[in-house]
Amino acid sequence: MKRYDRFVDFYEAYLKMHSHPTNRRLHLLGNALAIGALVYAIAQRNPWALFAMPAFASGLAFIGHRFFQKNKPGVLHYPVWGTLGNWVMTKDVLLGKLKW
């Protein structure tokens, strides 16, 4: 993977790695379930439920990459920017900047 010094450059490549609609939808579903796990953990005062957050988000993302996009996730090379890109992509879809 190419080296990136700025997030905006990385995000442009990130979107290309997430061009398949099903892959993108699985990422968004994983994020929604992760937020649900966070809400549940807070509401039930159950810190163990927090372990479901990365399982939901990463698990569905890896399925999307493996079976639909057929590539390797950018988060493996850029863990912080890959995670940030995931949430920025979710925001962009919710705001209508990216196609669902």
Where are these regions (language model features)?
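Membrane-proximal soluble regions of multi-pass membrane proteins
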Residues: 2-14, 70-100
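Membrane interfacial helix-start motif at the N-side
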Residues: 8-28
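Alpha-helical transmembrane segments of integral membrane proteins
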Residues: 23-26, 48-53, 81
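Core segments of transmembrane alpha-helices
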Residues: 26-40
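Structural signal for membrane-spanning alpha-helices in multi-pass inner-membrane proteins
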Residues: 38-41, 64-65, 93
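Helix-coil boundary and interhelical linker segments in multi-pass alpha-helical membrane proteins
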Residues: 39-50
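Transmembrane alpha-helical segments that form the membrane-embedded catalytic/substrate-channel core
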Residues: 55-69
